[in-house]
Amino acid sequence: MSDESPNYSVQVLERTVLLMDILAQSSGPLSLKDLTARSKLNISTCHRILNDLVIAQFVEHLPGGRYQLGLRLLELGNLVKNRLNIQELAYPQMQELHRKTGETINLSIKQGNDIVYIERCWSGQSGVHVVRPIGGRAPLHLTAVGKLFLADLDAVELLEYVNKTGIPASTSKSVSEFERLKNELAAIHQQGFAIDNEELEEGVRCLAAAIFNEQGRVVAGISLSAPAQRIQYAWSQDLKRAAKDISRELGCFL
């Protein structure tokens, strides 16, 4: 079977998961011999997969030749846990904002070069057609929440994002020039909230405030979307208060 075939890739993945499951179910570290016996894989295959997992830090190779699950799994698990906690903590605040404004309230996180919508309070009365469903994505530089994440980057990371994506426009009002984007990010630092001025969708404006974790890094954003003519910039203060309350529950007291 060719190493490039889909069946081979699936087989390798299944064997990788099998070895990680065996390590997870063990009360202590296991030797290569133990793992080979329990997995029923030949020793060369088992050793090759374990080496790859060690390089990726999913598995730790201990003195004496034994193996145990690595700390990277804990890091990834904490990321998932934080995201679940954010949804649970944010939803009451989102409901209150929706009740007060009557507009669509979104909760989004960063994934790669996009934001992903993970929760929403919406009603037909808001008058905003929801184009991107829960799980939908949008570029960072075209969204209010995305700009919050960009404002959290250092200069090198920001330039890397710009070079990688090319910051293309979606509407005639999109921010697609680097200098203009830097000016907007500087304004976010000063005012504490971000604006999408019909940059993703014509006729829709958004306001957003950042949610921070205990390290003071942006982990999510809460946003309000409304028809352009109906947006009230005073709502930004409500968003900031809600985001601050959620951040405090996540351990951020900045």
Predicted regions mapped to residue ranges:
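Cysteine/selenocysteine-centered motifs that mediate thiol-based redox chemistry or coordinate metal-sulfur cofactors
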Residues: 157-162, 166-168, 244-254
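N-terminal helix-turn-helix
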Residues: 1-83, 237, 244-248, 252
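Short loop/turn microsegments at loop-to-beta-strand junctions
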Residues: 8, 64, 105, 183, ...
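A structural signal for short hydrophobic beta-strand segments in well-ordered beta-sheet cores
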Residues: 59-60, 107-108, 211
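Short, structured helix-loop boundary elements
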Residues: 9-13, 32, 66, 70, ...
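Extended hydrophobic
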Residues: 173-245
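Amphipathic alpha-helical effector-binding/dimerization core
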Residues: 65-164
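Amphipathic alpha-helical regulatory segments at dimerization interfaces
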Residues: 38, 89-100, 191, 245, ...
